[in-house]
Amino acid sequence: MADINSLVLSGRLTRDSELSYTESGMAVLRFSIANNRRMKKNDEWIDYPQYFDCVIFSKRAESLNDYLKKGKQVVVSGSLKYESWQDRNTGDKRSKVNIFVDNLQMFSSGSNTIQMQDSDVNSLTNHKKEDVVKDIDIVDDKFSEDIPF
C-alpha cells in the first residue's frame, strides 16, 4: 500500500518564477513561497516565516510563467519530493525537499482569484494565453481578514 504524500500551502512568491527546459524539451517552472506560521507568545502574535521551493512541469509551466511574480499570493497543492546530491565544489552531501505542484490558485491584487488545475492543461495547449485567462472563473475572496483561530 502506498503512503499518502499530499499537501496544501498558501503564501507569497519570494521572487519571479524561473522557466527552464530539460534536455528532452520539457518545460520546468521553479518558484519559492514564503509561508508565515503564526504563533501566540506572551499575548502577542508572532509570524515565523518558512520558505518552500515549488516546481511545475510541462504546458502549465509555460502558461503560468508570466503570472507568477514576486509578492503574488498563491495556494498550491501537490506532493513533496526529496532530492539529494553531492556538491561538485566541496564534495559535501546536500539535500532539499521540493513541492511538485498539481494545482495552483492565484489571488489577484483585488478580492478575486484565478484558479488553474489539471483539467485546465488541455485547454491551454490549443489557445493563446490571453484567451485562457478570459475563460477562467473569478471567485470572490470572502476571507480577506485574518481568521481568529
UniProtKB/Swiss-Prot annotation:
The keyword DNA-binding applies. GO terms for molecular function: single-stranded DNA binding. Coiled coil: none annotated. It comes from the Bacteria. Transmembrane segments: none annotated. Gene3D superfamilies: Nucleic acid-binding proteins. Keywords: DNA-binding. One of its GO terms (biological process) is DNA replication. InterPro entries: NA-bd_OB-fold, Primosome_PriB/ssb, ssDNA-bd. Residues 4-108 form the SSB domain. GO terms for cellular component: nucleoid. Homotetramer. HAMAP family: SSB. PANTHER family: SINGLE-STRANDED DNA-BINDING PROTEIN, SINGLE-STRANDED DNA-BINDING PROTEIN, MITOCHONDRIAL. This is Single-stranded DNA-binding protein. The gene is ssb.
